[in-house]
Amino acid sequence: MMLSKKNSETLENFSEKLEVEGRSLWQDARRRFMHNRAAVASLIVLVLIALFVILAPMLSQFAYDDTDWAMMSSAPDMESGHYFGTDSSGRDLLVRVAIGGRISLMVGVAAALVAVVVGTLYGSLSGYLGGKVDSVMMRLLEILNSFPFMFFVILLVTFFGQNILLIFVAIGMVSWLDMARIVRGQTLSLKRKEFIEAAQVGGVSTSGIVIRHIVPNVLGVVVVYASLLVPSMILFESFLSFLGLGTQEPLSSWGALLSDGANSMEVSPWLLLFPAGFLVVTLFCFNFIGDGLRDALDPKDR
């Protein structure tokens, strides 16, 4: 009986090992991510927030720039249809929070996409080529990283005025710098692997090695960093808008709404609470998802 129990345990462990070995990296990562309750709950909440910012302006009877002269600085009210209340100009806060969420999320996701594309290609090329080329590319990266970014944004706003496109350009210019440095470090360790040497011996071009062999092997790190980059970029855009360097009226972002709400929080606290609540919850969701992806893709846990 004891022997049978040991045999069954051995067979069970062996089958579990075969099951793990039979799964790919991404299948195993997905399984472990789905077991992370905080990450899954955050993903669900984030999807609900995304649906809200997309659908709320379409379903609402008010536009983001409509003025209700009879309901200026009105508290949240179910009967009037202003569920989040109105601002000092009589504009519906629910719609403005949704429109602001669209812009804030677009800025965060766009910055992450720029970081993924530009940073991954730049870092992998720099690390793979090495030598003087790597030194020159890294010095250029350090120069860009040391540039006073706030001064650059103020300069853009002074010459071209407040424009959401300028925010995309300004944030996109700095979002990829850290990504490139991280990918370069990963590439330096990958370029000594046997499969890279085999590709070199087989006559595969530099671009082919980078795109087909190096980039797929750094995607785990890239995905994790990109998921953690989105909330930092949203927060940075909110900071710019809070200072008055972001979106221009009548458009808004969560940062601009926070700035407006902070000026009247004593008499109209809902103007601060609703955009602040959405911003905080979104940032927490992205950070929990990033932590979940990091744990799921960590090779030490495989």
From Swiss-Prot:
GO terms for cellular component: ATP-binding cassette (ABC) transporter complex, substrate-binding subunit-containing; membrane; plasma membrane. It comes from the Bacteria. The chain crosses the membrane at residues 39-59, 103-123, 138-160, 164-183, 214-234, 270-290. SUPFAM superfamilies: MetI-like. Keywords: Cell inner membrane, Cell membrane, Membrane, Peptide transport, Protein transport, Transmembrane, Transmembrane helix, Transport. The keyword Membrane applies. It is found in: Cell inner membrane. Residues 101-290 form the ABC transmembrane type-1 domain. Pfam families: BPD_transp_1 (PF00528), OppC_N (PF12911). It is a multi-pass membrane protein. The keyword Transmembrane applies. Residues 60-102, 161-163, 235-269 are periplasmic. Residues 1-38, 124-137, 184-213, 291-302 are cytoplasmic. Gene3D superfamilies: MetI-like (1.10.3720.10). Disulfide bonds: none annotated. GO terms for molecular function: peptidoglycan peptide transmembrane transporter activity. GO terms for biological process: oligopeptide import across plasma membrane; peptidoglycan-associated peptide transport; protein transport; tripeptide import across plasma membrane. The complex is composed of two ATP-binding proteins (OppD and OppF), two transmembrane proteins (OppB and OppC) and a solute-binding protein (OppA or MppA). Part of the ABC transporter complex OppABCDF involved in the uptake of oligopeptides and of the ABC transporter complex MppA-OppBCDF involved in the uptake of the cell wall murein tripeptide L-alanyl-gamma-D-glutamyl-meso-diaminopimelate. Probably responsible for the translocation of the substrate across the membrane. Plays an important nutritional role and is involved in the recycling of cell wall peptides. Belongs to the binding-protein-dependent transport system permease family. OppBC subfamily. This is Oligopeptide transport system permease protein OppC. It comes from Escherichia coli (strain K12).
